[in-house]
């Protein structure tokens, strides 16, 4: 999730919890 978030902000929505780590 974190890796995708760095690639695109839109991906952070999918990650969700992953985004919380960052």
Curated annotation (Swiss-Prot):
Q: Which UniProt keywords apply?
A: Ribonucleoprotein, Ribosomal protein
Q: Where is this region: Disordered?
A: 1-22
Q: Determine if Transmembrane is one of this entry's keywords.
A: no
Skewed-composition ranges (Low complexity): 13-22
Per the record, GO CC terms?
A: ribonucleoprotein complex; ribosome
So what family is this one in?
A: Belongs to the bacterial ribosomal protein bL32 family.
Protein name (record): Large ribosomal subunit protein bL32
* Source organism: Ectopseudomonas mendocina (Pseudomonas mendocina)
């Amino acid at each position: 999730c974190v890796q995708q978030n760095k690639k695109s902000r839109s991906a952070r929505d999918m990650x969700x919890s992953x985004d919380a780590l960052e």
